[in-house]
Amino acid sequence: MPMRLQKSTMCGLYAVLELAANPDRQVSAGDIADKYDISLNHLAKVLRALVRARLIESVRGPGGGYRFAGNPKRVTLLDIIALFEDTGLDLQEAASDDHEESRALHKVLRDIDEIAMTTLRSVSITSLLKVIDTERRKTERGPNGASARHSSAGRA
């Protein structure tokens, strides 16, 4: 069962990744919205939350936009996800807690929750950008591993 993230969370992740990948320039909200096919109004709300969290900065004026404000080696997936998601597993303590089965189930679910949090906390923006770069290079090489630029399709 894959992890399901809210639309706001995905927008936040896309925005942070886009800004961290372009540290030398400001990126407009419109550019991010266009690239990821996100509603500009929804993205604006997400960007405000990221600014409040001091993960990104808003740059006003000509050529303005947004830029990443954190240290990409220290900012983690959990830092961003926690802004938009309830990251705690809400296990309702039922009256059946006096049963071994209930206590065991709660323990296992808490352990799973802690593993997920530890994993999200261990993935930095820098490491995710490296994964993206690797995926981009695979796509450029094409399905047979040959570089798309050097394929025989373009030769006479």
From Swiss-Prot:
Protein name per its UniProtKB record: Putative HTH-type transcriptional regulator BadM
PANTHER family: HTH-TYPE TRANSCRIPTIONAL REPRESSOR NSRR, WINGED HELIX-TURN-HELIX TRANSCRIPTIONAL REGULATOR, RRF2 FAMILY
Entry's Gene Ontology cellular component terms: cytosol
Pfam families per the UniProt record, alphabetical: Rrf2 (PF02082)
Molecular-function GO term, any one: DNA-binding transcription factor activity
SUPFAM superfamilies xrefs: Winged helix' DNA-binding domain
Entry superkingdom: Bacteria
Segments of this protein annotated with the region Disordered: 136-156
Coiled-coil intervals: none
Alphabetical UniProt keywords: DNA-binding
Compositional bias annotation for Low complexity: 145-156
Keyword Protein biosynthesis in annotation: no
Residues in HTH rrf2-type domain copies: 4-130
